[in-house]
Amino acid sequence: MSHRLKDGLSLCSAVALGMAISTGYPAGIVAAVGMPIACLTPASRKLAFRNTISYYLAGLWPMVSGAGHFTGSVPIAILFWAGTATLLSAPWALAWTPKRGLHCLWRVILAGIAGIAPPLGLIGFISPMTGAGYLFPGTGWAGLAATALLPGIILALPDSRSRICVRLALPAMVALAVGSHSLAPPEPRPPANWIAVSTHFGDVSRPSQEFAAAQSIQQTVAASSARVLIFPEAMVPRWSNATREFWRQTLAHCRARGQILAIGAGLPRNTVGTTAAAEVDLVKQYDFAAAIRALQVDDHESPPPANPGPDPNASINADPFENTLLIQGAESSTFYQRVPVPIGMWQPFSKRGVPLRLNSPGVIRMDGQRAAVLICYEQVLTYPIVASMLQSPTVLVGISNMYWFADTPIPRYQESALRAWAKLFHIPYLVAENS
């Protein structure tokens, strides 16, 4: 086979793998485990970079429409898409070598680690490591190691000096995969009396929509006999003393019944001089009747107020905030998002937005369980889940607010990835998504 034909086939393979994983289906995630093979087989480093960036551009195409909604700018979304693909391709291009053999193995491993560990891990999308749970279910860290080693071992096949080692390693991995599928017990069920409630509220950032969502959630909590109820990300855009007052009756009801409400909420990092008493006054000043009318009348048909005056929530909404899973009711604690969306939420050169919390705990104790929580963006990365698994969780919880990505495969990829990690470590998982 000529080098030109071989390089062409490897390019087609890289693009096909990227397109497969972009669908978000488990089969595509498994296929992407072969990405290092397609990207490192060309005859030069330049061609290896070409293959790798082609994989990422094909795999990350849903980001363009999704990030366009998030940032409000399609050009910025395209720039982020192309920049992300370029940065993630760099370690694989550096890992390329014209030689084959076991010395190629450590290059593949280092390139894989570079793509999932910070700083690149902060944008470490569509990692080939995600497929470990579908290839080696229930094997935990051994399965993760096998997934990292597998492409390098296959790349070492052409080297005659490596074949004895490869002949031993490759059948061992096949046996591990077959054994894990045939011997693995059924997927574990979530803890008793735990439920995750997915919603269809859309954008809840406006007061009328937030009010409608809050009413629906409160009614769900009141009617449920579950011990733990988990709701999606950002269902309370800003949790403060004012909103706590509005939720007071529901939280008292939860405490009386021994229920735990886990809800996505934004916590202001400062109140810009707004005291707790002043925040409670904001609730008393809030016109809930007007909010209800806004739900019934199309905004475009509603005449603007003659003198709207200052927005009583402006001082809160303008503040930097924490994106959290707030635990209230029979227990009280807060889980902080560790890796928010770069630029859109985490703004390293601004005092606004959500801070990066790489050293924050990845597990929170809730109802006697150790819950590893992944908040939206963290579900498409590898670093947050690996960091959480080091803390021995007993259940995996994913919350997200995906109404702006509803027309993309991203929500499907999130759940497929979450399920893959749950299968790998054989723990139950729950998903609460707002669309």
Describe the function of each predicted region.
Residues 1-182, 421, 428, 433-434:
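Membrane-embedded alpha-helical bundles of multi-pass enzymes
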Residues 27-36, 55-59, 198, 225-239, ...:
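Short, conserved active-site loops that position catalytic residues or coordinate cofactors/metal ions
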Residues 43, 72, 188-189, 221-225, ...:
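Flexible, charged surface loops at secondary-structure boundaries
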Residues 160-186, 318, 326, 332-344:
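A short, flexible N-terminal coil/short beta segment enriched in small residues
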Residues 173-260, 269-275, 288-294:
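Membrane-interface segments at or immediately adjacent to transmembrane helices
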Residues 236, 241-243, 250-255, 269-435:
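Solvent-exposed soluble domains appended to multi-pass membrane proteins
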Residues 260-262, 430:
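Metal-dependent active-site segment of extracytoplasmic phospho-/sulfohydrolases and closely related
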